[in-house]
Amino acid sequence: MLHSITQLLSTNPYVVVLALDFSKAFDTVRHATLLQKITQLDLPDPVYNRFANFFSERSHCVRYGGEVSTILDINASIIQGSALGPVSYVVNAGDLTTVTPGNQIHKYADDTYILVPASIVREQKP
């Protein structure tokens, strides 16, 4: 991203950086939607199968002391810290990459930045 900012500054006096924070981004990804988007990428079968296996038939329960809760199925969320987590989120949010001409978007996992070259920046006072 620093390289992109430097390039934009070579032809524009300012670059506005919009940082977007999606609340609970990893928790809101539905597995069925993600797998549908992965299918649209036309990846080789072994790659698709890896994702499908990772997101299919997941469940969880809580053990506290000697007690175990009811087992619940999981049909949404990406496991944070997993190798497929950041890639899965980027695939899921991939259709959010349309920006106006001249602007750039940079994403990694749930961090999204939009770079907007500008010739004038006006300070807004409260």
Per-segment meaning from a language model:
Residues 1-126:
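Nucleotidyl polymerases of mobile genetic elements and RNA viruses
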